[in-house]
């Protein structure tokens, strides 16, 4: 099976020399230098392409370190060790990862480069999501293994612009479809002009587009991309998520990736993960039951054992947990099954080369770097401790009385803070940093007056 990185010169990717030529010819004049923040958003700067070539490649760029210590609203909040008023909110360094350089076809004459984050002395910013994943990938590399990943990100399309959505309080919006268009060619045809622009835009930015399809919620769709190495997939995911919103906005429409935008089916982000050795042979595949190797069984057992402890990296927001509803295709039971969509972990693949684990817990609001890092950490823990794999769950896991996916962010935070697995895999600094992020999110939610409270209490209480 050909994977994305087997094609060394994907259309849309740029080498440094190609960028120099295009800047000289005037076809590229802007370079976006960006990293992914705690919330999974691209943050950074738009640079003059000339300045990028003359200065930033050699000397890098700077950004305020509060960018990894703010809430969704970009408020400065207390509790972060690495960034605060007491520390003066200084800079960290954006180091261009030149292998990620690509065109941005939906922005005129623009290219984008993903950045790693470092301090002034060159040491990594360990709380950076990309660096967190890189650290887990390095652990795999020490064993001679490579993680291959794919993300399946769902979204809901509205005919309203983002400005119109805000003006209406994000209520009474018009979804781009008025009925369930799951696999519907007729229904998805209504939204094809936008979907095609997104597919072509992503292909022009170096992503390997496989397909698009309708989903269950009104206006809900999914665009699938070819799997690649773990870091590359997460880079692509971040580019896609931002780009899809920008392309929709240019058409006067809006897209939401939030996990549960309304009372219907939520937006998922199923993550597929497999391991390969130095000979590109699947590590998880073998002669055991369901085609698993002993290492594959331990790896999958680790996913189950660590799921509740690491749920914060799979479901980072208050809204994330409202997606876990029985019968909604979002999991509630910490079980695994063979091609069983009612389980948290689904074993899929019809050959040793395609065998992989699908994690069905993350929603569309997930930070992919953190979720994939959590899967690698849990799998390695299972391998190192040689955890036995429980039997595959057959039937409807929604009715299972066993361990459950945490039902609230507060529950997930409690599991995270007491997790030895999280501290051993990521370190105390990362654990405390993201625990504080969850506390900030919970404090904001606890202080909010909701529509539910107003509806029940305005007159009657």
Protein language model features and the residues they cover:
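ATP/Mg2+-dependent ligation/transfer catalytic cores
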Residues: 1-211, 253, 401-461
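Catalytic-core signal marking the mid-to-C-terminal active-site face
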Residues: 2-6, 14, 26, 246-247, ...
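Conserved structured core elements
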Residues: 13, 130, 149, 192, ...
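A generic structural motif
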Residues: 37-39, 118-124, 187, 227-233, ...
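Short glycine/proline-enriched loop/turn "hinge" motifs that connect secondary-structure elements
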Residues: 102-109, 147, 212-217, 264, ...
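Histidine-centered divalent-metal-coordination microenvironment in nucleic-acid enzymes
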Residues: 154-168, 214, 218-226, 258-279
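Acidic, His- and aromatic-enriched active-site or binding-groove loops in soluble protein domains
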Residues: 170-197, 230-241, 245, 279-285, ...
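Gly/Pro-rich turn-and-neighbor structural signature
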Residues: 226, 233-239, 245-246, 252-261
């Amino acid at each position: 099976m050909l994977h994305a990185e087997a094609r060394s010169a994907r259309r849309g990717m740029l080498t440094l020399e190609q960028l120099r030529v295009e800047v000289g010819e005037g076809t590229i004049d802007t370079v976006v230098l960006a990293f992914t923040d705690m919330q999974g958003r691209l943050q950074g700067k738009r640079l003059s392409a000339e300045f990028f070539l003359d200065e930033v490649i050699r000397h890098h760029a700077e950004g305020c370190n509060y960018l990894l210590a703010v809430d969704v609203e970009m408020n400065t909040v207390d509790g972060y060790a690495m960034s605060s008023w007491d520390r003066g909110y200084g800079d960290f360094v954006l180091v261009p990862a030149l292998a990620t350089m690509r065109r941005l076809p939906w922005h005129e004459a623009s290219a984008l480069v993903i950045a790693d984050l470092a301090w002034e002395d060159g040491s990594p910013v360990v709380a950076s999501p990309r660096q967190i994943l890189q650290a887990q990938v390095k652990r795999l590399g020490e064993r001679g293994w490579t993680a291959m990943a794919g993300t399946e990100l769902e979204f809901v399309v509205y005919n309203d612009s983002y400005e119109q959505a805000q003006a209406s309080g994000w209520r009474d919006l018009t979804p781009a479809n008025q009925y369930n268009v799951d696999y519907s060619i007729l229904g998805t045809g209504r939204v094809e002009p936008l979907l095609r622009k997104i597919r072509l835009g992503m292909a022009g930015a170096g992503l390997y587009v496989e397909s698009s399809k309708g989903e269950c919620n009104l206006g809900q769709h999914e665009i699938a991309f070819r799997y690649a190495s773990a870091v590359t997939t997460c880079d692509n995911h971040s580019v896609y998520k931002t780009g899809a919103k920008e392309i929709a906005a240019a058409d006067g429409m809006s897209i939401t990736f939030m996990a549960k935008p309304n009372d219907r089916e939520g937006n998922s982000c199923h993550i597929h993960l497999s391991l390969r050795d130095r000979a590109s042979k699947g590590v998880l595949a073998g002669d055991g039951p369901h085609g698993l190797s002993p290492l594959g069984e331990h790896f999958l057992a680790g996913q189950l054992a660590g799921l509740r402890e690491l749920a914060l990296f799979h479901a980072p927001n208050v809204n994330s947990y409202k997606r876990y509803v029985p019968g909604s295709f979002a999991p509630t039971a910490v079980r695994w099954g063979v091609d069983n969509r009612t389980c948290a972990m689904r074993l899929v693949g019809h050959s040793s080369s395609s065998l992989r684990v699908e994690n069905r817990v993350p929603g569309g609001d997930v930070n992919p770097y953190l979720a994939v890092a959590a899967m690698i950490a849990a799998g390695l823990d299972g391998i190192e401790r040689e955890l036995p794999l429980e039997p595959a769950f057959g039937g409807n896991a929604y009715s299972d009385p066993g361990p459950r996916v945490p039902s609230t962010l507060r529950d997930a935070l409690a599991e995270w803070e007491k997790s030895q697995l999280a501290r051993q895999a990521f370190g105390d600094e990362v654990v405390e940093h993201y625990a504080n992020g969850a506390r900030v999110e919970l404090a904001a939610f606890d202080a909010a007056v909701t529509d539910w409270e107003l509806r029940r209490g305005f007159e009657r209480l």
